[in-house]
Amino acid sequence: MKKAIYPGSFDPVTLGHLDIIRRSASLVDHLIVGVLNNSTKTPLFSVEERVNMLREVTKDLSNVEVLSFSGLLVDFAAEHNVSVIIRGLRAVTDFEYELAMSQTNRVAAPGIDTIFLTTSLKYAYLSSSIVKEMAMYGGDIHKFVPEEIIDRVYEKYGIKQ
């Protein structure tokens, strides 16, 4: 059984993330979406909220499991017997960072490979940061995040839709 992890903060999950999740799920037998609980950052959504949102928007994907983790990704991968990490790339600038991370992971855990999926063109500009900034000012985020979570994003900024 080929297992992979698609890690991220997903704060909030975007349609770009969901695109990578769906495409990744079609490539492997079992995909773990790993939601990073980074204690050095102050996220908009708690790790529990992010996990729940991801579970909701991936419920139709029977081979996708959503779990949270903290610490090193390679340790999380080892705990779950995963040898493939999937990363999405939007632009060349993403590649430089992701290449360095994949090489670091390969040194730390030689049995782990990284697969890069380029984001679909219609989502190449999209990031969670853009979504948060748009929502903070009451901008329309319907084209950026799954329908199921739109109200929750606005609620974080005290905006009623």
UniProtKB/Swiss-Prot annotation:
Gene3D superfamilies: HUPs. Its cofactor is Mg(2+). It is an enzyme of class 2 (transferase). Keywords: ATP-binding, Coenzyme A biosynthesis, Cytoplasm, Magnesium, Nucleotide-binding, Nucleotidyltransferase, Transferase. Pathway: Cofactor biosynthesis; coenzyme A biosynthesis; CoA from (R)-pantothenate: step 4/5. It comes from Lachnospira eligens (strain ATCC 27750 / DSM 3376 / VPI C15-48 / C15-B4) (Eubacterium eligens). Substrate binds at S9, K41, L73, R87. One of its GO terms (molecular function) is pantetheine-phosphate adenylyltransferase activity. It comes from the Bacteria. The record marks H17 as: Transition state stabilizer. It holds the Pfam family CTP_transf_like. The keyword Ligase does not apply. Belongs to the bacterial CoaD family. Its EC number is 2.7.7.3. ATP binds at S9, F10, H17, G88, L89, R90, E98, Y123, A124, Y125, L126, S127, S128, S129. One of its GO terms (cellular component) is cytoplasm. One of its GO terms (biological process) is coenzyme A biosynthetic process. It is found in: Cytoplasm. Reversibly transfers an adenylyl group from ATP to 4'-phosphopantetheine, yielding dephospho-CoA (dPCoA) and pyrophosphate. This is Phosphopantetheine adenylyltransferase. Homohexamer. CDD domains: PPAT (cd02163). It catalyses: (R)-4'-phosphopantetheine + ATP + H(+) = 3'-dephospho-CoA + diphosphate. The keyword Magnesium applies.
